[in-house]
């Protein structure tokens, strides 16, 4: 969550927490890249269910809720309750333009799929990172 090398959920939360009221947070690229994020509790649940099953083929596990990086940054800002703007920073393209999970095979064979809304997971992540920042931990 610290140091600038974290993944997008932690980075967006950290940036929103550390942003000054009326300030801005940087988002690399145009922010139109899309991703889906899976909260750790559901990742663990998915792996546990897979391990208990008889299914033994490669399978995707992820959220099917896709969001643009700009909308994701705005979600972190909204959770913060601050008036903060997004500043898109022009950088060479990093990674793929869009990425999402298809849980059809997993759900068909395991009978379950992650279903926690992204906002709920982000609120939990935000709260944890905010505590770390406020305690000066890194």
Segments from the language model and where they lie:
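Flexible, glycine-rich beta-alpha linker
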Residues: 1-13, 34
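C-terminal substrate-binding subdomain of Rossmann-fold SDR/epimerase-dehydratase oxidoreductases
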Residues: 18-138
